[in-house]
Every structure is written in C-alpha cells, then in structure tokens.
C-alpha cells in the first residue's frame, strides 16, 4: 500500500507483479506555478547533438538518464553534457539497458529483464558506477529501461537508496513519434509535469519536436528544473491520454 502511494503505482499492478509505470509530478510550492522538468533517456545508440545544442542555446536544463553502454559509446556526447553542469544532471539508467523486472524469461517490449534480484542490483549499481566515473557525481535517481517496473524491482531499487524517476508526459514514445505529435503532447504540459523523451536517436523527430514544443512552453511562461532541484509527488490525477 505504501509503495503504491509513494510511486502512484496501481495496487492491482503490485498485486499481480505485472510491470507498471511510475507516474509523478513535481511537488510545486504553489500548484499553478509554471514549472516543469525535462528528462532525457540515453539508452543505447547515438548522441542527438542537435537536441543538446538546442538546450544549451536556449539554456533549458534537463535530467539525463544514461546507461553505461551509452556513456562508453558516446564520448563526444558525454563531454558536451559535462561541459554544462549548470544545465545537465546525469543520472543512472542502468549498465546495459535491462528492464527492471525480475524472473526467468520476463520481458518488457520484447527486452529481456533480470533473472533474479542480484542481476537487477548489478544493473543498477554498475550503471551508477559508470555515471560517477564519468561525471564525478554519484547518481541519486534511477530510471529503468522501458520505464516499467515490477514490485520486486521497485522495492530492490529503493532499498539500494535510489529514487525511482517517473514521468507524467511521454513526449516521444521512445523517439518514435513525428514532430507534430511531439509538439501536441508538449502542448498538454501543465505546471508540475515531468516530461520523458530521448536523446539517443538523432535520426528521429525528437529534436525538432522538442525544440518547437519547449519554445511554446517558454512563451507560456514555463521554466524548467532538474529532478535534483525539486521534490516529486505521485501523479494522483494522472490522465491516461497524456502518456
């Protein structure tokens, strides 16, 4: 019950052990303050220099969830992120982008999870070590591959001392959406929303969609923060059409 309330995970999801998403909002001091958080996943693949260049030019901060394998393969991208610590907070996305589900043969979106708790802990711990080695800062937040978790995984991650990073607006659906759809999703952003998008697929429409959508939010008076700057709370009024 407490885990469900803390993370806004459906009770039936915890009872059935099926993977669930964690939906969260920023804990704003005043509910209508136009503040939102942009989070970017760097799973595997490449480095979206166009997107990061836009964020630097516009001075828009973001929380980046990077895997060890992305860090190892994208020295240029890591160097750019590290050169702007005032904008980018780099957090743990795991070592090898293994979903946070436990049990032989368990999968999320066709990606195999962890056979046991020990493997999950290694995925989290080794990812954190890579982030700390690359940045000099120990991560506080963890977002699992696919952003879905089963109850055992959630408990294990939190027992390791990490905060589990959720979201309330899925901007690009794994960098698969077209520009206009991304813009439309960002148009739905409200005060306190946590946006999830991707920075590892430069061939996608994510950079163009985010650039247009984030500029529009700026015109509406929004400012952006990293997850280290503000507490989060369960998205109790989360609307399914917004993911």
Regions found by a protein language model. Give the residues of each.
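N-terminal pre-catalytic segment of deacetylase/amide-hydrolase enzymes
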Residues: 1-38, 44-53, 57, 78-79, ...
């Amino acid at each position: 019950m407490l885990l469900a309330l803390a993370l806004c995970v459906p009770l039936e999801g915890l009872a059935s052990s099926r993977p669930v998403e964690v939906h969260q909002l920023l804990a704003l001091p005043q509910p209508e303050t136009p503040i939102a958080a942009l989070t970017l996943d760097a799973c595997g693949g490449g480095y979206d220099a166009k997107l990061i260049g836009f964020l630097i030019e516009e001075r828009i901060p973001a929380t980046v969830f990077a895997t060890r394998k992305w860090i190892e393969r994208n020295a240029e991208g890591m160097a750019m992120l590290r050169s702007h610590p005032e904008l980018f907070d780099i957090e743990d996305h795991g070592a090898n982008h293994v979903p946070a589900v436990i049990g032989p043969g368990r999968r999320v979106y066709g990606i195999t999870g962890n056979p046991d708790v020990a493997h999950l802990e290694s995925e989290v711990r080794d990812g954190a070590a890579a982030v700390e080695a690359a940045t000099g800062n120990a991560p506080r937040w963890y977002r699992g591959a696919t952003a879905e978790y089963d109850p055992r995984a959630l408990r294990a991650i939190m027992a390791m001392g990490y905060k589990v990073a959720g979201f309330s607006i899925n901007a690009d659906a794994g960098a698969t959406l077209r520009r206009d759809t991304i813009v439309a999703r960002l148009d739905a952003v409200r005060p306190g929303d946590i946006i999830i998008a991707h920075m590892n697929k430069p061939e996608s429409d994510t950079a163009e969609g985010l650039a247009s959508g984030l500029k529009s939010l700026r015109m509406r008076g929004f400012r952006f923060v990293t997850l280290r700057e503000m507490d989060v709370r369960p998205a109790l009024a989360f609307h399914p059409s917004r993911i």
